[in-house]
Swiss-Prot record:
Reactions it catalyzes: tRNA(Phe) + L-phenylalanine + ATP = L-phenylalanyl-tRNA(Phe) + AMP + diphosphate + H(+)
Superkingdom field: Bacteria
Assembly notes: Tetramer of two alpha and two beta subunits.
Identification of the protein by name: Phenylalanine--tRNA ligase alpha subunit
Gene that specifies this protein: pheS
GO cellular component: cytoplasm
Main location per the UniProt record: cytoplasm
Family, per entry: Belongs to the class-II aminoacyl-tRNA synthetase family. Phe-tRNA synthetase alpha subunit type 1 subfamily.
Major enzyme class: ligase
Amino-acid positions noted as binding Mg(2+) in the UniProt annotation, renumbered to this chain: 256
Amino acid sequence: MREQLTALKHEALDKAEVAKSEQDIQAIRVAYLGKKGPITEVLRGMGKLSAEERPIIGALANEVRDEIKNKLDEKSKKLQEAAIKQQLEQESIDVTLPGRPALQGAIHPLTAVVTEIEEIFLGLGFSIGEGPEIETDYYNFEAMNLPKDHPARDMQDSFYVTEDLLLRTQTSPVQARTMEKFAGKGPVKVVVPGKVFRRDDDDATHSHQFMQVEGLYVDKKVRMSDLKGVLETFAKQFFGQDRSIRLRPSFFPFTEPSVEVDVSCGICSGKGCRVCKQSGWIEVLGAGMVHPRVLEMSGFDANEYSGFAFGMGVERLAMLKYDIDDIRQFYANDLRFLMQFKDV
């Protein structure tokens, strides 16, 4: 048996040395060390040996088995290293190629528009205010001269949270909250950007959620001409120095008198086109002189103080400025649309 084991060892080691792949190594391992291999057969036949030969042959068989196993493991490692080296040579990286830049995001167009509006009014001496999006019925309606039985309430379908709380339908409630903080002493000069909510069906020009910027200026001897001057300055800085505005009579419960504000069409320079419906003007916001009752409810003496207020839809301004025809694009999270404003 000694000669048989020695012969098996040399035979297995020679085959391992010339093995070309992992498959060859596995085949040798099964052939010589497997359950049906010759070394296993030798170990099974040890029962026929004498008591003196049994430990000697057993030790030799284990030694041969370990030597073959170690040789196969060593050869397998070399083959793996050679395969990795070959793969690296074939898949070498050209480090001279320029890297791929990381994808950079962009400011959302509505954020960019709000920021621009804020900067314009900060330059005009206004401060930035804010108020709650879940508002009380009092501040959203009554403080804005809309009592519970006022017919104008039917014009706005609202999202009520409780009987007395609702998602604000306008940023106007911040007018009352801000004036209350000043305790009847002016001047009050603030713009308030924020989200508002109405039960509108979403389409190309309507959304159940949109953004407004509210403006308020209260002081002694504030006049309608002050309102026009501020809004004309805003229009020229926002749309371009060649633009002008006009005021049309309108009605809002919280202002008296009230006006709709149009800006001259930038497509046709006021001559008339499809965009402005041949009028030369495009409606952009509502405004007016603060109603005396709103001043009184907020703690100001309407005989001593006056003021103006205005409200503009951010999405509408953005659509006009960037020639966007569908308000839903602002909220679709489509990168193809949003990345167009990367340099805005």
